[in-house]
Amino acid sequence: MGGFLSHLTPEQNVEALKASCGPVRGNIYKHDDVIVDGYLGIPYAKPPVGELRFKKPVTVDVWTEIKDCYKYGPACVQTGGFEQIAGPRTPTPEEAGCLTLNVFTPRNASSEFKNGRPVMVYIHGGGYELCASSDFCAYSLSGTLPLKDVVVVSINYRLGVFGFLTTGDNVCPGNFGLWDQTLALKWVQKHISSFGGDPNCVTVFGQSAGGASTDLLSLSPHSRDLFQRFIPISGTAHCDFAIRASENQAKIFREFAEFHGFSGRDSSALFKWYQEQSPETLSNVKGYKKSISGFLTFIPNLDGDFFPKPLDELRKEAPKKQMMTGVTEYEGLMLASMNPAFSPADVGLTLMPQGIYGKDVVSNPDEIQKIFYEKYVEGVDKSDELAMRKKLCEALGDEFFNVGVIQAAKNAAKHGNEVYFYTFEYVNPDSFGMWDGMMPFKAAVHCTELRYLLGEGVYSKFEPTEEDRKVMETTTTLFSNFAKYGNPNGKGATAEIWEKYSLNRPERHYRISYPKCEMRDVYHEGRIQFLEKIDGDSDKYQELVYGKKKSAKI
């Protein structure tokens, strides 16, 4: 909706940087006595069209002519039902030139990092179907993390059908969006030194589907050696929306093709049909309803290639990394407010488990759905709509985000990774813009932290108060400290305020807020244990994470 520095216009640099990818010219972003150079729309892969459509990305050739990198590249083709949140896409989405990335690098030499600054690579969210790196005002982004002595890279990757088509077999294993992200990380390894970054000190961070992508990248043998630290924000590989079994995802794509008129039988015919369709057809989901359970439609799958083993085995064998992960206080608040199907709240609390716990997930869906509903309405006056809406918000946040994030923290710690766990609980009550009147109460919601991390308001233009600026300073310091030192407390911290995550106290976490940040012992009022029990016994979760099935019986 608008960054806090979106009213400023950068100066275009006439001098070219002789980068190893090819010469580039970028923008000059001025912040008092600090200059940040920004290079927008740098191609990292050949256009994924023609014979390269629905294929793994191919590295772009080094160029010799100066490339003007003054503007973001086009967004990848958008799909899905979140347009009311994401708003109109700028620039216009397209297939041809969408695989680009952006680099923001402080101009002056670092006094601390002689071999190049630490690098932070951001992966945007949007349900694997929407959004782009261009959603973040470049001037605003340049005024956040890059002022903390790090180089920031943001990327585009293929979305929806174009990013995640699979036939469930060798004809089209899929996961092209994840292969795109991996190729972008390889670009960083090869070329970031030209931009003042250290390829041996890379942190990947992402939010929502970008957070799930970040965690998935830390597991795959194709990507996990390309970075040292990672920050999955409000999304991990363990979240409900992160990944599906290949046969279930293939069923969705067959159903979607049949919805648009496909009548073939085998995978080759299905793949050929997809190759022949226009972007307009493949991005049109209006009227389509999937038969497979889950919040999102076109998502990664456990393909046997990018993910050759179940997630727990991959986590166990992956090189040990430092992980920082967390959620906002009320992840589900905006989801509940924006979806008219969830009103009144009692209807929402009935429909929600029906969409999540189907026969493809648990063997006793009716029983699980009933238990889920009764757990969240326990002790609540059903005639009190405000109290019921709060429970709906809790249920949405717990199911889609809160349980998956703490499960990832536990799983990572179990396998020897150093973890820092947090909740983000600060909110400016005037930050919701047009959605203000739809909110039953105000709290930090899904995407709230992006205002303070990247300078961009998702629900309204970010016009920071003095208090907002203090929260931004705290947030960017914590995240950049982790990227630089592997410790959000900073270099050589002796009296650590933010403790490392411990399996002995699994709910203990760091609360980021204002005026005080502090460690807390209870995570979301202890509600998560109930959902962990369901997930621990569900066929879907057990198959994806552990490679085995176990029917849920509570």
UniProtKB/Swiss-Prot annotation:
**Main location group:** cytoplasm
Question: Coiled coil located at which positions?
Answer: none
Q: Which GO terms describe its cellular component?
A: cytoplasm; plasma membrane
Lipid-carrying residues in chain (N-myristoyl glycine): G2
Enzyme Commission number: 3.1.1.1
Q: Which CDD domains does the UniProt record give?
A: Esterase_lipase
**GN (gene name):** cest-33
Topological relation to the membrane, as annotated: Lipid-anchor
Is the keyword Membrane assigned to this protein?
yes
* Species in which this protein is naturally found: Caenorhabditis elegans
Q: Where, subcellularly, is it found? A: Cytoplasm; Cell membrane
Keyword annotations from UniProtKB, A to Z: Cell membrane, Cytoplasm, Disulfide bond, Hydrolase, Lipoprotein, Membrane, Myristate, Serine esterase
Look up keyword Membrane and say if it applies. Answer: yes
Catalytic residues at S208 (acyl-ester intermediate), E331 (charge relay system), H446 (charge relay system)
Question: Which cysteines link up through disulfide bonds?
Answer: C76-C98
Q: Which Pfam families match?
A: COesterase (PF00135)
Question: Under what name is this protein listed?
Answer: Esterase cest-33
Give the GO molecular function terms. Answer: carboxylesterase activity
Q: Which domain of life is it from?
A: Eukaryota
